[in-house]
């Protein structure tokens, strides 16, 4: 029964990856067409374009790795497995930093705080987006290189695993992976929670101000607050289980866990990227309108 559940989780994982690939390809193509047509692109769309490309490559790599792992009857070289792991770590870290940068941009642009720091960020963050995107890539490259450096002290075994024989031995490399993940994800988590909290606080102040002035509080600014807040909250709901599941998958005792636990970890690990990509399309006016036209929902 548990084997059937695990097999179903693998099938669901493949389906979710296909959905994620299609969604991110859609995000990339729409923003690319807008960029080419108007010869300009907004700061948020520039981040979404970078995020779409990164997630498309990451999910494609994950899908290829899953298919290869399930279908291969031969032993897998440690170098090929290490290549998959390192590429996935770099792309995953880059995509998470891009989302963090997107949340920071929404927080700075939408909130109405009058603090000098916020006013300075409002004026200067948009022109700095290309450099900040490059910084995200460099940070991801640094954490990946840190993993490589630390893993040199505990090299991988020569061969990883056969389809029906031994399991992959990652006990020696677990410390380096945990350090890399914690260094990258903890700062991202703090920034995203802070951005969401500031946005919620700003929305509450805005509603109180509208009520005090005896005017309707549902206006374009309120709608922008709510839309960005929903996207951030849903991101955190998907991101927290994803981070835990991803970390558990690399723990030494993961290979000895029951099929049910492995299935749950697999589902949570693959649900985040496709789910958040769908949420981006739903909450982004241009992407939502284009998607409706494609699906023939527009009358």
Swiss-Prot record:
Localisation: Membrane; Cell projection, Cilium membrane
Ranges per topology, Cytoplasmic: 31-46, 103-131, 194-230, 284-299
GO biological process: respiratory gaseous exchange by respiratory system
UniProt cross-references to InterPro entries, sorted A to Z: TAS2R, TAS2R4
Extracellular compartment residues: 1-9, 68-81, 153-172, 252-262
Residues with glycosylation annotation: 164-165
Alphabetical list of Gene3D superfamilies matching this protein: Rhodopsin 7-helix transmembrane proteins (1.20.1070.10)
One term of GO molecular function: bitter taste receptor activity
Membrane-spanning intervals of the chain: 10-30, 47-67, 82-102, 132-152, 173-193, 231-251, 263-283
Entry's family note: Belongs to the G-protein coupled receptor T2R family.
Purpose of the protein: Gustducin-coupled receptor implicated in the perception of bitter compounds in the oral cavity and the gastrointestinal tract. Signals through PLCB2 and the calcium-regulated cation channel TRPM5. In airway epithelial cells, binding of denatonium increases the intracellular calcium ion concentration and stimulates ciliary beat frequency.
Descriptive protein name: Taste receptor type 2 member 4
Gene: TAS2R4
């Amino acid at each position: 029964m548990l084997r059937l559940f695990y097999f179903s989780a693998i099938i669901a994982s493949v389906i979710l990856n296909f959905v994620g690939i299609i969604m991110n390809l859609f995000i990339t193509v729409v923003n690319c067409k807008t960029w080419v047509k108007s010869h300009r692109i907004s700061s948020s769309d520039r981040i979404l374009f970078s995020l779409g490309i990164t997630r498309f490559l990451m999910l494609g790599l994950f899908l290829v790795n899953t298919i290869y792992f399930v279908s291969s009857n031969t032993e897998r070289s440690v170098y090929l497995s290490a290549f998959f792991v390192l590429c996935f770590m770099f792309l995953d870290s880059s995509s998470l930093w891009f989302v963090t940068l997107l949340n920071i941009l929404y927080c700075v642009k939408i909130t109405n705080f009058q603090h000098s720091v916020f006013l300075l960020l409002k004026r200067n963050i948009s022109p700095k987006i290309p450099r900040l995107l490059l910084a995200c890539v460099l940070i991801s490259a640094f954490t990946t290189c840190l993993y490589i450096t630390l893993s040199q002290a505990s090299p991988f075994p020569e061969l990883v695993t056969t389809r029906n024989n031994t399991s992959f031995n990652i006990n020696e490399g677990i410390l380096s992976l945990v350090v890399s993940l914690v260094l990258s994800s903890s700062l991202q988590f703090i920034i995203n929670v802070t951005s969401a909290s500031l946005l919620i606080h700003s929305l509450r102040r805005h509603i109180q101000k509208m009520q005090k002035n005896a005017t309707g509080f549902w206006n374009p600014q309120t709608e922008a607050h709510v839309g960005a807040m929903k996207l951030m909250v849903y991101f955190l709901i998907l991101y927290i289980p994803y981070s835990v599941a991803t970390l558990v998958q690399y723990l030494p005792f993961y290979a000895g866990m029951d099929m049910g636990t492995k299935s749950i970890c697999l589902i949570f690990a693959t649900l985040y990227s496709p789910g958040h990509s769908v949420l981006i399309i739903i909450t982004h006016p241009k992407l939502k309108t284009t998607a409706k036209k494609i699906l023939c929902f527009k009358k």
